[in-house]
């Protein structure tokens, strides 16, 4: 649609948008993709729970980089943090994740950050750190994922937990810190 109208449109491509029937079709297709992703996450969890013989006490999902069509909020780099909503904010492979409850803060667009945030780009991290440094940082956590292809995900490439916890208080209550005992991240050679 954009290419057909681009010759006559005063809107730059980087600011192009859809409306009307095209917008409705986009939302329809996006909902299908989001539903598929949710079912895929559930299938993975069901397999792990069954294989490990776990008993599920509480279950919820946290997604990022999506359109919340119920509230018409575009979340890029953020997750929903409605009042009372359970959510997870991952920090890094070493330090784990924050288990939180949303406060529904309108000043934060009823959202929270979807993670710690990078201190540097993926390519910069691969140049700045070594696999040896990465292995040392992951001491005490079982992982087969430390290697050159996952160096961009090393803990040193992300902001620290204290930086995040100290800044998200208006959006969420931090209920617990989940520390990893096992970590898996697919890489190029996996």
Question: Where do the language-model regions lie?
Answer:
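Domain-length cofactor-binding catalytic modules of enzymes
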Residues: 3-190
